[in-house]
From Swiss-Prot:
Gene designation per UniProt: rpsU1
NCBIfam families per the UniProt record, alphabetical: S21p
Pfam families registered for this protein in UniProt: Ribosomal_S21 (PF01165)
Record protein name field: Small ribosomal subunit protein bS21A
Disulfide bonds: none
An example Gene Ontology CC term for this record: ribonucleoprotein complex
Key words of the record: Ribonucleoprotein, Ribosomal protein
InterPro entries xref list: Ribosomal_bS21, Ribosomal_bS21_CS, Ribosomal_bS21_sf
Transmembrane intervals: none
Family per record: Belongs to the bacterial ribosomal protein bS21 family.
GO molecular function: structural constituent of ribosome
GO biological process: translation
Length: 75
């Protein structure tokens, strides 16, 4: 992964690198590989993530179609 450093601005380059790594899911992957995960636990986690993803998409679709009200903004 490469990030250009312009005008010796290392802070900006680091922010860009972190953003790229976040988007690619590298931080999450590193956290997951910290400890061994049994194959059965991995399957269960992936299934739970898939269920969560499907529910979220269904909720967004229902909000878009006007079946349920959109969540109010927090104060």
């Amino acid at each position: 992964m490469q990030v250009l450093v312009r005008d010796n601005n290392v802070d900006q380059a680091l922010r860009a690198l972190k953003k790229k790594m976040q988007r690619e899911g590298i931080f999450r992957e590193m956290k997951m590989r910290d400890y061994y995960e049994k194959p059965s636990q991995k399957r269960a986690r992936e299934k739970a993530e898939a269920v969560r993803r499907v529910r979220k998409l269904a909720r967004k679709r229902a909000q878009r179609e006007g079946l349920i009200a959109a969540p109010r903004a927090s104060r």
